[in-house]
Amino acid sequence: MLYDKASAYTYDSDKSAPKLAVIFPGIGYTADKPLLYYASRLARHYGYQILAVSYGTLPENVKGDHAKMKQAFELAYEQTEQALQDIDWNSYGSILFISKSIGTVIASAYASRHNIKGKSILFTPLTDTFSFTRPGSIAFHGTADPWAETDSIRTLAEQKEVPLFLTPNANHSLETGDVQADLSIIKATMEHVNRFIATP
């Protein structure tokens, strides 16, 4: 089954302990925007406490500028370390990271560096995300995403054994510009998210 690998990765966790979902937004895609908002609501529905990370002021116009992107990552990661420094990860029976864009890099790097065993939802990941991606992740990508080339994302996801859901003609927000199509996309995406979160 699609989610078996994620379930196997977290099978030995204490299901009776509290559950925590951490939201890692993008630079311009905040936690109150559709993908993160509805994913958070689903997580709350399944009993997760919700914590949203905030990065503060980051460099603008980073697209296509490797130096600025690196600076943005380092600043955002530093803010993330500070925001999460008091969390006792071992006190939670289930941990879920929900991330978007540069947030997928930050979430994956944080989980890797702190050896956090949990599930991860990657909305519109960047190629750098897969440098850190761990078992128990799923990813969503639009084929018209100007921030990440589809063939590269597909190849990296296959190499890391990360289930990847492709949305034709969708941009970096998983939107097409057509309202009815976008409503259908968010519904289909959240159905996948719901099944992923609900799988023990």
Predicted regions located by residue number:
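Serine-hydrolase catalytic machinery in alpha/beta-hydrolase-like enzymes
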Residues: 2-91
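Short beta-strand/loop motif that positions the catalytic acidic residue
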Residues: 133, 139-141, 145, 153
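Conserved alpha/beta-hydrolase fold motif
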Residues: 92-97, 120
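Active-site nucleophile loop of the alpha/beta-hydrolase fold
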Residues: 26-27, 55, 121-129, 142-144
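Acidic catalytic loop of the alpha/beta-hydrolase fold
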Residues: 142-148, 172-173
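Catalytic histidine-centered segment of alpha/beta-hydrolase-like enzymes
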Residues: 170-185
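Gly/Ala-rich beta-loop-alpha elbow adjacent to hydrolase catalytic centers
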Residues: 95-108
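A conserved short beta-strand
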Residues: 115-126, 135-136
